[in-house]
Amino acid sequence: MSEETGEGASGGPRGGPVLVTGGSGFLGVHCVLRLLEAGHRVRTTVRTPAREETVREMLRTAGAEPGDALDVVVADLTSDEGWAAAAKDCAYVLHVASPYPPTVPRHEDELIVPARDGTLRVLRAARDAGVRRTVLTSSFASISYGHAERERTYTERDWSNLDGPHLSAYAKSKTLAERAAWDFVEREGDGLELSVINPVGVLGPVFGPDYSTSITLVQRLLDRDLPGVPRLSFCFADVRDLADLHLRAMTDPAARGERFLGSSGGPMWVADVAHVLRDRLGPPAARVPTRRIPDALIRLASRMDATLRGFVPDLGLVRGANADKARDVLGWRPRPPEEAIVATAESLLRLGLVKSAASQYT
């Protein structure tokens, strides 16, 4: 047994449960599932008592019946209540929870304050409970936004420019929350270790109606909510691989004090995603649009659509993510983005979450 990782030869855990914040979220529930599969006891937080059944139902959809191996507790990022009890006796914390509004917030502080202050609440509770290491889920948005270059590949050495133009409230919230986390551990951590994962767009199997914005892209393509595809590009990673990356960062001594970009390949245009759906899914994706919408039309439509307005500065922009560090240091081996796209679509269809194509899928 490694004294540094606390893992036995079989990969099983030693000591108390692992705390996962935000267990009802898309990435959070996949982290819970991966930990359970590895033999860990898991404690996860939800915002309200009613969300416990949501977590367990999603795990049942994934084929898991954790029973007593999973403890669900109530703790909200906007309140101190519940966090000390949540972190008690835990050796590790995966802080996955983060506010993400369904619509553009009226003021950026609606996102920034709970993201930053919530992260600090979790870290204080972890420190006070004697947690060995916290793995923070940050974002590619804390690395690659606010820069002047129209085409650039980013690494963990980069940070988003908070003084740059067109910086969204979400990008600010993730950048400020991550910087606050590093500052806290350096100044007040009292031995608490920190590792950070910076995922790109998250795709992969969904277990219920709570999922990432990237999943919504696939859903809207299948539903033909858009008459064509905007000139936007994204990097993607499969949620299962990102859960695996969190576990690797949790126990590997080399992950201490490090950031890791989580991306499975280079940037893909939305048109590329549409073609993957058409080529790999057959009839359910036969009507997925592939014609590009002119930038001028997107700009015109954005005057009446706040969500669309947020994408206008990114038209034609290519942000690459170099994930060599996760591969080289942690031995991470993500699946190709095309597999993540197909798994996303198949799960949406299977759960009846695609309006126009669900009846065609068997």
Residues covered by each model-derived region:
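NAD(P)H-binding glycine-rich loop region in Rossmannoid oxidoreductase-like domains
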Residues: 49-50, 60-117
